[in-house]
UniProtKB/Swiss-Prot annotation:
Protein's name in the database: Kynureninase
Electron transport as UniProt keyword: no
Source species: Shewanella woodyi (strain ATCC 51908 / MS32)
Gene that this polypeptide is encoded by: kynU
GO CC annotation terms, alphabetical: cytoplasm
Listed cofactors: pyridoxal 5'-phosphate
Length: 430
């Protein structure tokens, strides 16, 4: 497609966009009486307008029923998590038995590591990406120490080659093969939070399985961003949060995937709780833990219904819009941002702003990460003052995520015009 950095072109694309109306289903922040340009769906998604309605329903049922709401609410609380499963399974490409919403992201990963990181004297190493999200690194470090191992010996981090920003997948595969006899687990982010690089999870899973290791993924920046097929890819386990692209509010409930190969085996060691116990016998208050089959068997406590009500409001939208349709728009929208950005940068060659996200659309989601070469955080702060909500990551990267559910081509054009004005001011005043 031939792009144009003009308002008329952007508005025409919005008129042609079959998903454009979904933007009206979200609240857009207004600061000082002006609607801001919001490009941080990769950090915290916008609030669905139906969220309040869903929460109010649960508040009304609580007021009406008290504890009996577990069984008599419009959506009975005892099984509330189950209504989130179909749409969640669609988003990650899983059987419904392989998915459940529960807890929060790093908590869920710790629970999954109990079952799927089982180091032995021979197989104890974990291969992961360098510069992964810090919470994931803390997860790996503390899990390894929990087993009495030294992180320096057990964790192998794959870095970009010198002078590059992205990790080459052939280097990951080479590391897997080089450590074939000692590798217990390959654990990566589906999409790297910093660069926006999308990894080929099917390829990495196949490589890990080829040497007798397991493969797991943190999907925080992948779920709701790119289509996935975890079951078909034979991924062993995965976890995600729901407050980024899934728009469920800050710190809200997470989700997990456990491949049916494992989920159907109730003998797998895990940390148990009563919500993972056989649901037909849960309220008999028996002493012996009998886990359910499927991902539900990893649940610990009963569902946080208020948070799940917000998530339901967003998942309903995803189910209606369709992740494949959203991806099709996302590819075009992010490509337009890339075009607009490069058009402006080419006009201001003395100001070094560089995209470090893959240029290949199949190797990224919607996020573009921009490195402030030779500048500092003041450029980002000026962007914020100009009415753009973006995201800064130390030491020198601005992340922009044109989110297809609620961002428009006109948003991208206006962002470009804002960047142009800032570049002009930066050139004049530094």
């Amino acid at each position: 497609m031939i792009f144009e950095n003009t308002l008329a072109f952007a508005q025409q694309q919005d008129r042609n966009d079959p998903l454009a109306h979904y933007s009206d289903q979200f609240h857009h922040p207004v600061i000082d009486g002006k609607e801001v340009l919001y490009f941080t769906g990769n950090s915290l998604g916008l609030q669905p307008k139906t969220a309040k309605e869903h929460i109010n329903q649960e508040l009304e049922d609580w007021a009406k029923w008290g504890v009996e709401g577990h069984f008599h609410a419009v959506n009975p609380w005892v099984s509330y998590h189950e209504i989130l499963t179909p749409a969640s399974a669609e988003l990650v490409g899983a059987n419904e038995s392989e998915v459940v919403c529960m807890n929060s992201l790093t908590t869920n990963l710790h629970l999954l590591f109990v079952s799927f990181y089982k180091p032995t004297a021979k197989r104890f190493k974990i291969i992961s990406e360098a510069k992964m999200f810090p919470s994931d690194r803390y997860l790996l470090e503390t899990q390894v120490r929990h087993h009495g191992l030294d992180p320096d010996d057990a964790i192998i981090e794959i870095s970009p080659r010198e002078g590059e920003y992205l990790i080459r997948e052939e280097d990951i595969i080479a590391a897997v093969n080089d450590n074939a006899d000692e590798l217990a687990l390959l654990f990566f982010g589906g999409v790297n939070y910093f660069t926006g690089q999308l990894f080929d999870m099917q390829r990495l899973t196949k490589a890990a399985h080829g040497v007798g290791a397991l493969a797991g993924f943190d999907l925080a920046h992948a779920v709701g961003n790119v289509p996935m097929h975890l079951h078909d890819w034979d991924v062993d386990f995965a976890a995600w949060c729901t407050y980024k692209y899934l728009n469920s509010s800050a710190g809200n409930v997470g989700g997990i995937f456990v491949n049916d190969r494992h989920g159907n085996n109730t003998k797998i060691n895990r940390f148990g709780g009563w919500w993972g116990h056989n649901k037909e016998r849960r309220f008999l208050m028996e002493n012996s833990f009998e886990p359910m089959t499927g991902a539900e068997g990893w649940q610990i406590s009963n569902a946080p219904v208020m948070g799940m009500a917000i998530l339901k409001s967003s998942l309903d939208i995803f189910h209606e819009a369709g992740i494949e349709n959203l991806r099709a728009k996302s590819l075009k929208l992010t490509a337009y941002l890339e075009f607009v950005f490069n058009d402006i940068v080419n006009q201001f060659t003395d100001i070094k702003l560089e995209i470090i996200t893959p240029t290949d659309p199949t190797q990224r989601g919607c996020q573009l990460s921009i490195k402030l070469v030779g500048t500092n955080k003041e450029f980002f702060e000026a962007l914020t003052k100009a009415g753009v909500i973006a995201d800064f990551r130390e030491p020198d990267v601005i992340r922009l995520a044109p989110t297809p559910l609620y961002n428009s081509f006109e948003d991208v054009y206006l962002l470009g015009q804002t960047l142009k004005v800032l570049a002009q001011n930066w050139r004049q005043h530094g």
